[in-house]
Each structure stands twice: as structure tokens, then as C-alpha cells.
Curated annotation (Swiss-Prot):
A UniProt-annotated Pfam family: CK_II_beta
Record-linked InterPro entries: Casein_kin_II_reg-sub_N, Casein_kinase_II_beta-like, Casein_kinase_II_reg-sub
GO CC field: cytoplasm; nucleus; protein kinase CK2 complex
Protein name: Stellate protein CG33236/CG33240/CG33244/CG33245
GO MF annotations, alphabetized: protein kinase regulator activity
Source species taxonomy: Eukaryota, Metazoa, Ecdysozoa, Arthropoda, Hexapoda
Induction remarks: In wild-type flies, it is strongly down-regulated by double-stranded RNA (dsRNA) interference mediated by Su(Ste) transcripts. In males lacking the Y chromosome, the absence of Su(Ste) locus, relieves such down-regulation, explaining why it is strongly expressed.
Free-text tissue specificity from the UniProt record: Probably not expressed in wild-type flies. In males lacking the Y chromosome, it is testis-specific and constitutes the main component of star-shaped crystals.
Additional detail: There are multiple copies of the stellate gene in fruit fly, encoding proteins that are extremely similar, which makes their individual characterization difficult. Thus, most experiments probably do not discriminate between the different members.
Subunit description: Interacts in vitro with the casein kinase 2 alpha subunit (CkII-alpha). The relevance of such interaction is however unclear in vivo.
PROSITE patterns associated with the record: CK2_BETA
Family: Belongs to the casein kinase 2 subunit beta family.
Disulfide bridge positions per record: none
Organism the protein comes from: Drosophila melanogaster
Amino acid sequence: MSSSQNNNSSWIDWFLGIKGNQFLCRVPTDYVQDTFNQMGLEYFSEILDVILKPVIDSSSGLLYGDEKKWYGMIHARYIRSERGLIAMHRKYLRGDFGSCPNISCDRQNTLPVGLSAVWGKSTVKIHCPRCKSNFHPKSDTQLDGAMFGPSFPDIFFSMLPNLTSPLDDPRT
């Protein structure tokens, strides 16, 4: 990123703009700042200062270390909220997460899923709601699966009553 881009970007803008991070949605500042949503996260005051600054400060020594994990864990919480589910729903409908590679699923849109809620266990996978299988995404992403967690697809379909999993559709 050039220094001219740094002047108009926050850490969040920079991080979301990195190739491979397209599965993530933007967590609103008010959600990030709410201390209830920060419970159990380490170093929140120091990291919060870095990720919410209007300018990225590369001299802070923290860039892309703890911030990535911290934002990822806030993201995992946010996508389970009403606003987060709506944001992920838009991405799902656009096909931002890719489609199922299984031919019998007829290019079914997929959702991101983590195989573990524990940071560092595995990278994100894509989950097909039709065949209920998990696959490696075609996109070049190395996001940690904990940014989504293992229950996200189930929560997504249970919390959005107007959506049904294709397996529940009698036409399939």
C-alpha cells in the first residue's frame, strides 16, 4: 500500500482490501467499540486504537499481528448478529464466497465455515448447504477459520427464516 493510500485509510480499510480477505464483511465501528462485544479478547484497548485510527501507523509495531486475530474474533461475533447476518446474506446472494464444486449441486452458492472456533487450527473452508460438504475455496484466501466458526452455516440458515437450505426445498 502506498503512503498516499495510508492517509485516507484505517487499518480496517487496509485489511479488508487485502487480496484473499473478500470473505470478510466490514464490522461497523459502533459494534467494534461496544465493550460487550470485546469481552474475553486480549489487548483490546491497544488494538482498538490501532484499527480505528484514520491513518495506518506502521511505526506502531503491531500491524497485521494481533489486529488480524482481534478483528477476526470480533468478525466471528458480528456475523452472528442481525446486522452481520444481513451483510453476509448479501454476500451469499452475490456469490462472493464461491459455488460448490460438486456437479450435482449445480453451482450452489456456498458460505464460509471454520472447522474450529479456536484461532490457528485451520484456514476457512466453504460449505455447500445442498450437499452439506466443506471444500477448500478457489479464491486465494488464508483467512483463519475461527473468523467464521464451525456453526456459521447452521446459524445463517436458522436465523434467516426467509431462507431455507436447498435440502429443505422439496424441488431438489
